Amino acid sequence: MAGPGAASSATAPPVLTRGVPVTQTPSHPTALTAAAPRIDTRHELGCTNTATVDEISLNGAPVVDGPAPDKDLAPLSMSVGTTQLWRFVNAATDAFLDLALIDEAGKPVPIQVLARDGSPMIDDAGHPTDSPLTTEPQLVPPAGRIEFLVSAPALDQKVYLVSHAVDTGCTGDSVPERRLGILTALPYTADAAQQAQVPPRTTSPNMFAGLLSRKTEHKRVIAFAEYPRPGDEDQTDFYIAERRPGVALVPYQMNGAPTITVPADSVEEWTVENWTNEVHAFHIHQVHFRVLSVNGQSVVDGALLDTDTVPAATAIAAPPPAAVVPAPRAPVAPASPAPADVTAASQVAPGQVRIKLFFPESLAGDIPFHCHLVDHEDNGMMGVLRVNPRGGRNPP
């Protein structure tokens, strides 16, 4: 990535590269079994969240729940007057993170985002975009990555790396605000200056540059759904399927047929729907996509991503009889009866993320896509996209 090299100059502060992985640890031996967590799908529209808080760590240091003293936080340090490039990966099994830096007074500290999910911030033509300083929290779902520049605080100051609370839906996990680490400054030394001289690096052309200007050749609707396992309502099966006539919900099978087949060098637009009462982390291997809209709201200058958060479904009041609104189509419309506090005049509006994808010839073969909440993935919320070489059959 060109960012580190570009930041090392006579006038710019020196830059170091830091890896900041976050991992999740089970609280007990059965925490990651097929039966955990148990999701009450009988009350899709009126549920109560009783989920516990996931345990996570930062660079191996456990993250403490609730207000944490400085001594219990993962230590982060850098020389005063320098800038570091932090490469942050959310390697937790199902913990969403909403990252920010704040000072001791609770004031946000600006960062400069250079890349998401391993792809530099570029426009559709492949040119680097301006990356202004921002104090906006950065939502990083499981499997998400973000790279950003951080400037050292003063010698007598402390800065906290925090994750703000995330609403994951009424059946989702509990994600409270937590301090992840504490950043302090060390005296500036010549050794630190020499260590910070990162040589410039070049990048190969991005194969997904020009994606937005390509003609869309096919549109699909991809649906997330959850239902109690037949005969065992204590166990939930998770599904991801293309929503079109004749397609049934079937949990992923290792040796099953591909969920979707596309010809190489094709361009598609997917509407990823979430019919459940918790957010999901949509992830596709090998491919980067551009987000076009979220819940109908257009996204401008979105980053190239391979992972994004799909909002939870919501209960909405039925429109007046004169209005014409398409009803949710089977088989992914919620099948369980609504609880007593939800009237028959309500219906479900799925959360939606609309994305654009390109499948180059070099990626011919099978490409998994799935929810990156590992318990969901392991219990069936996964599909396979097959990219046929030129001359292969067209998508169904």
Name every feature range the model reports, one short phrase each.
Residues 5, 84-85, 269:
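Alpha-helical secondary-structure segments
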Residues 5, 9, 13-46, 205-241:
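Predominantly extracellular/luminal regions of secreted and cell-surface proteins
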Residues 8-11, 28-30, 57, 100, ...:
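Residues in well-ordered beta-strands of folded domains
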Residues 12, 29-31, 82, 90-92, ...:
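Short, flexible loop/turn elements at secondary-structure junctions
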Residues 77-80, 206-217, 261-265:
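Surface beta-strand/loop "capping" patches
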